[in-house]
Amino acid sequence: MRKVLTLVLVAAAATADETIPGVRLTRDDNQHQHTFADLWHDAGEQQDWVVQTRRELHRTPELLFDEKQTAAKITQVLTALQVNFTTGWAKNTKRAELAAKGFVSGEGGTGIVAQIGSGKEPCVLLRADIDGLPIHENVDSPWKSTEDGKMHACGHDGHAAMLLGAAAVLKRREAEIKGTIRLIWQPAEEGGAGGKRMVEEGVLSMEPKPQAAFGFHQWPFLPLGSIGGRPGPMLAATELFDIVVSGVGGHAAMFAIQRVT
């Protein structure tokens, strides 16, 4: 899967000794020198499994700070891959505040942080989000949402599955990775600021501290196999605000007597 490969290449390049044609994951010039084609092959082997995982996650979407089944699936896979991880990240400390804004949220603690590599510097961080949206899915497919009023309408099922695919490829080559690759599955991206909560809990202060962090979002308007980026902000976010207008109302045909203070 090409997006799995993108994550692997980013991690490999950031933890390699130097940049050379292909991708180098080791200091030994005579062994374990893997080309783009090697990593492409490894990622391709994960494709069917990643697609199946994505569809499983799509069937059971969960809303912000309530992604318990999703987190359980992710940790089940990480355990099978023998990848070290910690759970309980992103506890929801603003449940009442979110409710006042119209969000139904859970207790949180559904964030996951995994680690692959030597445990030494350099460290690169890869991040995926995992929550769904309060939208009813009308599309009829074998992997349609089984939860009324909930849907993975923003692709976070795919993001979570692709990061698991990258974990599988990277774990296979763990002995060749000089530095550390930290993988984060973030809850509550859709209005709950789950990533900010994980930062408050110290995810960026863990040793070794990451020198770079990467996240990406699927984008159907780009050709398959391509990736887009730019310096600075890339995508927009939503925010809620109130506008209070005070004054004297009236008929639309009598606006002369109306006023706004």
Protein language model features and the residues they cover:
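Acidic/His- and Gly-rich active-site-bordering loop/insert found
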Residues: 20-152, 161-178
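Cleavable N-terminal signal peptides of Sec/SRP-targeted secreted and luminal proteins
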Residues: 2-15
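Hydrophobic alpha-helical membrane context
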Residues: 14-15, 141, 168, 229
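Residue-level detector of alpha-helical segments with a strong bias toward transmembrane helices
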Residues: 12, 165-166, 257
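Histidine/acidic-residue-rich, glycine-tolerant segments that coordinate divalent metal ions
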Residues: 102, 110-112, 133-134, 140-151, ...
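Hydrophobic alpha-helical segments, especially transmembrane helices
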Residues: 3-4, 55, 157-160, 218
